[in-house]
Amino acid sequence: VEWSTFLLLLISAYILFTCAKNVRQVRLRIIYYALSGFSFVIGMEEMSWGQMIFNWKTPSQLALINDQGETNLHNIRLISDHSDLVYGLILALIILVTLAANRLTKRIKDKNFYTPLLNLAPSKMLLIYFIPASLFSLCLYFNIHEYTHGFIFRGEEELMEMVGAFGLLGYSTSMISRLKNMQQN
């Protein structure tokens, strides 16, 4: 599952980078570059920046504070304790933007704001990935899992991350498709 998530994130990063290179609006270009960079960093974190591929030893100082003794930031205790909450809230924000984009653009008269919002808003079809991943993540953070309520299974963190990565891949492919359609018209 981790390898799949890693590959999905790197493919998404590449596609979003391609979007950034092809879009004309500077604001959208910056956003696509940021999304690409974010996807790349999260993908590399998933593989502990290559440690899982090249099998190097974790630096001793990092191993002391890393819950899994790996070369990554997301397993450092302070971050690890809140990563499910952060992931769940990021996905909840994506869900909110997806559901509210059309309503927001009708209320806001500033074309400089609503045009990029409409261009960047995910398709509602992608909610099939984002909603379960967000719910699983928040259930983990608030300790609603197999040991207390019996409906989430072992290894759910990795599965939740992969479902979110599938959603990101769907988003990135829809963005590149949207850009190509806009360029043809």
Please identify what each model-predicted range represents:
Residues 1-3, 149-161:
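Non-cytosolic membrane-interface motifs at loop->transmembrane helix junctions
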Residues 4-18, 89-101, 160-179:
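Hydrophobic cores of alpha-helical transmembrane segments in multi-pass inner/ER membrane proteins
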Residues 18-30, 107-120:
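Membrane-interface helix-boundary motifs at transmembrane edges
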Residues 26-35, 121-130, 184:
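Membrane-interfacial loop-to-transmembrane alpha-helix junctions, especially the N-terminal start
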Residues 38-45, 132-143:
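Aromatic-anchored segments of alpha-helical transmembrane domains
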Residues 40-60:
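Transmembrane alpha-helix/helix-exit interface in multi-pass inner-membrane proteins
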Residues 65-81:
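Juxtamembrane membrane-water interface segments that cap and precede transmembrane helices
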Residues 104-106, 138-151:
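Juxtamembrane "helix-exit" motif on the non-cytosolic side of transmembrane helices
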